[in-house]
Curated annotation (Swiss-Prot):
KW Glycoprotein (keyword) present: no
Gene Ontology cellular component annotations, sorted alphabetically: mitochondrial inner membrane
Predominant localisation class: mitochondrion
One of the GO BP terms on file: mitochondrial electron transport, cytochrome c to oxygen
Pfam families per the UniProt record, alphabetical: COX3 (PF00510)
Protein name: Cytochrome c oxidase subunit 3
Gene3D superfamilies listed in its UniProt record: 1.10.287.70, Cytochrome c oxidase, subunit III, four-helix bundle (1.20.120.80)
UniProt keyword annotations, A-Z: Membrane, Mitochondrion, Mitochondrion inner membrane, Translocase, Transmembrane, Transmembrane helix
Broad EC category: translocase
Record PROSITE patterns: COX3 (PS50253)
Reactions accelerated catalytically: 4 Fe(II)-[cytochrome c] + O2 + 8 H(+)(in) = 4 Fe(III)-[cytochrome c] + 2 H2O + 4 H(+)(out)
Gene source species: Chondrus crispus
Length: 272
């Protein structure tokens, strides 16, 4: 028979969420490490390098799905995401975006270090000899307009969600996802049409690392927005509780800003 003291001990007396033990952080770390190993093997043309990279990336996406499933269950169905918990989550997302900014800062540092003082090995000029750079006013400029437009549509969705305009929220978020897919398609087409590759010296390595890493962030942001669209259609995002979408929107605006720096620095200035 349950006594009153036992019930009192089982009642949570604080607004914080004590997360249950989860395997996903450890498994995600293993998948990310495997992706790095597979990427290095693929770049150096090792046997099965592309296979390891593909399998590791698929496993990473699967872990993202299962981890988000647990977080959504804890927030939407179990009610663990109180106001204080959401404040902590917002702070965590801000720190995550800051760490991503530092990541891209390293790529820009490598690019400007090589372009502002080109060495004799590449002809003491920038772009290096033998590199046919891409025209910044073709696909890159079109992709810039697409990403800027997607930033407008995701802001439209946020304002519609706060104003409880459900139909506009669904429409604007759907348009954002479509624009993201179009951007990724054009980026892949641009890669296929480029005359230089990742192994073509410092220009190719800095170009593909910076733009490719940004493309990976676009893919992650697209998946995040797609999850938000599914949750919005299932009435899991409301006028008062929509932190999942809010964090995805922050992330998407970060992707927009990074692309503007990439376009101005690498495509426009770096290719002139």
């Amino acid at each position: 028979m349950t006594t009153l003291s036992q019930i009192s001990k089982s009642v949570q007396r604080h607004p914080f969420h004590l997360v249950d033990p989860s395997p996903w952080p450890f498994v995600a770390s293993l998948c990310a490490f495997s992706c790095a190993i597979g990427g290095v093997m693929y770049m150096h043309a090792y046997v099965n390098g592309s296979f390891i990279l593909s399998i590791s990336f698929f496993c990473l996406l699967l872990v993202m799905f299962t981890w988000w499933r647990d977080v959504i269950r804890e927030s939407t169905f179990e009610g663990h995401h109180t106001g204080i918990v959401q404040q902590g989550l917002r702070f965590g997302v801000i720190l995550f975006i800051i760490s991503e900014i530092l990541f891209f800062f390293a790529f820009f540092w490598a690019f400007f270090h090589s372009s502002l003082a080109p060495t004799i090995e590449i002809g003491s000029i920038w772009p290096p000899k033998g590199i046919n750079v891409l025209n910044p006013w073709e696909i890159p400029f079109l992709n810039t307009l697409i990403l800027l437009l997607s930033g407008c549509t995701v802001t439209w969705c946020h304002h519609s969600l706060v104003s409880n305009l459900r139909n506009q929220s669904v429409l604007s978020l759907f348009l954002t996802i479509v624009l993201a897919i179009v951007f990724t398609t054009f980026q892949a087409y641009e890669y296929s049409m480029a005359d230089f590759r990742l192994s073509d010296g410092i220009y190719g390595s800095t170009f593909y690392m910076a733009t490719g890493f940004h493309g990976f962030h676009v893919l992650v942001g697209t998946i995040s927005l797609a999850v938000c669209l599914i949750r919005l259609l299932q009435y899991q995002l409301t006028q008062q509780h929509h932190f999942g979408f809010e964090s995805a929107a922050w992330y998407w605006h970060f992707v927009d800003v990074v692309w503007l720096f990439l376009f101005v620095s690498i495509y426009w200035w770096g290719g002139s």
